[in-house]
Amino acid sequence: AVFLAVIHHILHKGEDREKKKGNIPGVLFGLATVTELAATIYVNKKRKEQLALEPEQTAQSSRKKKTIANDTEESENGRRKKKILITGSGSYVGTSVEAWLKQWPEYYQIDTLDMRTQTWRTHDFSAYDVVYHVAGIAHADVGQVSEEEKKQYYRVNTDLAVETAEKAKREGVQQFLFMSSMIVYSGCKEKKITKNTIPKPLNFYGDSKWQADQKIQALADERFKVVVLRPPMIYGKGSKGNYPQLAKLAGKLPLFPIVHNQRSMLYIENLAQFVKRMIDNEETGVFFPQNEQYINTSDLVQMIAMVKGHRLVMVPATGWVIRLMKKIPGKIGILT
């Protein structure tokens, strides 16, 4: 396929942003990171295609506004300001969503809560309409983790998440958003994940997310709406995980295998807009927010190398090349 791509520096983006509109702007596709400067590759020229949203089930949420005893604050146009608690201060996703929502201070009041100590247990959740849980451990080098470290993944990704959801429900929070992950499908053979794909985590990291995913869904009822988000690899300025590592490798490796795969990705501001939509519409259900277009890993690596001015030789994906890539620390090998 021929890519109609425009290299766009994230540090200078934003000229197209329409603060007062609720629609989701252009689908962003790919990432080329050059040290502190991240570049985004657009699929289309207009950058106005809608983000592909595929809910696992039809969200059947009531649009009725419920009155909270200690919250009667309204914005100038009569819309009641929602109070949102982000549990997991300092996270990349949490801070990005917080910054996005703060563009509309008349509609959202946002607090963050550090979950690394036990003080969160005494925090009053009853003052909030929405709790958005982003605390968790990610980016595991699954091949080099001790048994004790694995237990820590379950304590944080499973136990902490479920206990937070239970507290939110017990104290009258109307909606709980949980950041699960596409990693719950890591053991599936399907190349493209759909609403019919049954989760099958491949390792302890994916399983820790899947355990929480199921238990939190079970808490949902008419008074407690639960949104489970299973995003793919998230990218953007300052992102962590696979793609900054991949960008670094693309500027150093002399060769890279030609692989015929398709990977879904999600630009951080598209995720932030999606979270805003979930809150505004008081949704409930399981969702897979992702860019509409899938990307081929080899094509992405070539683009990154080109941006960096690095000569990268693409070679057929023979057995020895794939085995070599699999030995790369972290999760980069999975991308091939």
Predicted regions mapped to residue ranges:
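Conserved beta-loop-beta element that borders a ligand/cofactor-binding pocket
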Residues: 214-237
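NAD(P)H-binding glycine-rich loop region in Rossmannoid oxidoreductase-like domains
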Residues: 121-163, 167, 184-187
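Mid/C-terminal beta-alpha module of Rossmann-like enzyme folds, strongest
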Residues: 274-334
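A conserved pocket-lining segment of Rossmann-fold NAD(P)-dependent short-chain dehydrogenase/reductase
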Residues: 245-266, 270, 277-278, 288-290
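Short amphipathic, positively biased membrane-proximal segments
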Residues: 1-77
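Glycine-rich NAD(P)-binding loop of the Rossmann-fold in SDR/ketoreductase-type enzymes
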Residues: 152-160, 203, 207-208, 266
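Conserved Rossmann-fold NAD(P)-dependent oxidoreductase catalytic core, especially the SDR/UDP-sugar
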Residues: 162-204, 219, 227
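N-terminal Rossmann NAD(P)H-binding glycine-rich loop of SDR-like oxidoreductase domains
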Residues: 84-101
